[in-house]
């Protein structure tokens, strides 16, 4: 029987030994006598000792485990250190059985850049021209396409095959025909490049995130942008200039000349504060003189002939964020960019007349050197990412 069970069975405290003097007679007049001799005290002594001893045993037996447990770890500092060491390096510290500790948490991790580099992009391939289409009627060239490629979304910039959807020379001067040929790409994640040539040979256009089609309101996304490629006269470097280690971007854009037997290869980057994206490129080569051709298209063609040094400035005008007037098409016109009653690029339904003004959508300059209004000599629409559809 435990101590607490005994307390419940005997709620009254255990009688203790009292001195002999406390034992007295009963009330006066009574005949009963209370024992007062040494015989009574000696008979109660074993029970008293047993009670005291049992109480001490019960007390120490209840307190000793907690005291021993509380004093065991401080008394042995090496045990505590060993326990902590095992905890920090235990394999059970996986976040479930303990606090997660990475295997190399306290180690210095040395990382080096990967020597692997993404492969270079394959050159753009322009497909879709008819075999009998003359070079003078082919507006977009590979050199200009490479410049446009830099600005298109990444998912399309890795595509190296551009397919001709519409050509004014091959399909006739009709905006309706242009809409019909582009309609088959509805719902596909592709991009379109609109290319225009004016009467002075200037080449410009737009990148369209959606296929051009008649719609009651503006459509498209901020991926759209306007662009232009203009020819600029440039002086050759002086004889004392060292162009051996000249660095910069290079492209293969050149112009036809009357003949020369010297050549210089140079390339420069030009960024104007007013233009969000612009590039100036230059190349000259030396071979036999080809027949002279005044076609403006040959200013951008890659020729195996003698050329003069000519600078081609390519400018792109990305979305400005001012408004969302990306593309607006109706049966009688096609427009890209707008604001304040002006269009960034506008073409009529006969693809004969065009308008280009500064627009809030792209913050562009006039795209044609003819002025705000220009005459159209050629129009092309190219699709990127169609997979040969």
From Swiss-Prot:
Major subcellular site: mitochondrion
Comp. bias regions, Basic residues: 1-12
Region (Disordered): 1-45, 67-90, 238-269
Single GO biological process annotation from the record: response to oxidative stress
Top-rank taxon, per record: Eukaryota
Domain (TLDc): residue spans on this chain: 138-385
Compositionally biased spans, kind Polar residues: 22-45, 241-256
Biased composition annotated in UniProt, kind: Low complexity: 257-269
InterPro entries per UniProt: TLDc_dom
Entry's Gene Ontology cellular component terms: mitochondrion; nucleus
Stated family: Belongs to the OXR1 family.
Designated name of the protein: Oxidation resistance protein 1
Organism of provenance: Neurospora crassa (strain ATCC 24698 / 74-OR23-1A / CBS 708.71 / DSM 1257 / FGSC 987)
């Amino acid at each position: 029987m435990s101590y607490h069970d005994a307390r419940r069975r005997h709620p009254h405290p255990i009688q203790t030994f009292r001195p002999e003097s406390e034992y007295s007679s009963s009330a006066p007049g009574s005949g009963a006598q209370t024992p007062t001799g040494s015989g009574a005290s000696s008979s109660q002594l074993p029970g008293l000792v047993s009670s005291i001893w049992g109480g001490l045993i019960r007390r120490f037996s209840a307190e000793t485990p907690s005291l021993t447990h509380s004093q065991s770890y401080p008394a042995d500092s090496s045990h505590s250190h060993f326990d902590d060491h095992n905890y920090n390096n235990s394999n059970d510290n996986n976040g479930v059985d303990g606090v997660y500790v990475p295997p190399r948490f306290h180690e210095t991790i040395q990382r080096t850049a990967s020597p692997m580099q993404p492969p270079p992009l394959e050159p753009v391939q322009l497909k879709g021209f008819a075999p009998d289409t003359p070079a003078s009627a082919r507006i977009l060239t590979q050199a200009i396409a490479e410049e446009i490629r830099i600005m298109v979304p990444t998912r399309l910039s890795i595509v190296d095959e551009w397919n001709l959807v519409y050509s004014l020379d091959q399909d006739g001067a009709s905006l309706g025909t242009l809409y019909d040929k582009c309609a088959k790409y509805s719902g596909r994640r592709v991009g379109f490049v609109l290319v225009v040539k004016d009467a002075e040979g200037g080449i410009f256009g737009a990148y369209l995130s959606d296929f051009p089609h008649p719609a009651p309101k503006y459509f498209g996304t901020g991926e759209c942008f306007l662009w232009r490629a203009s020819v600029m006269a440039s002086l050759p470097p002086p004889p004392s200039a060292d162009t051996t280690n000249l660095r910069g971007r290079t492209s293969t854009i050149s112009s036809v000349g009357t003949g020369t037997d010297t050549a210089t290869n140079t390339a420069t980057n030009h960024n104007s504060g007013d233009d969000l994206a612009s590039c100036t490129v230059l190349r000259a080569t030396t071979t036999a003189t080809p027949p002279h051709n005044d076609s403006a298209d040959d200013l951008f063609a890659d020729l195996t002939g003698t050329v003069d040094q000519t600078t081609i400035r390519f400018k792109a005008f990305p979305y400005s964020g001012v408004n969302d007037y990306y593309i607006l098409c109706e049966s009688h016109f096609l427009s890209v960019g707008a604001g304040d009653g002006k269009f960034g690029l506008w073409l009529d339904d006969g693809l004969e007349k065009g308008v280009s003004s500064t627009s809030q959508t792209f913050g562009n300059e006039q795209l044609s050197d003819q002025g705000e209004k220009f005459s159209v000599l050629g129009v092309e629409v190219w699709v990127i990412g169609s997979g040969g559809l």
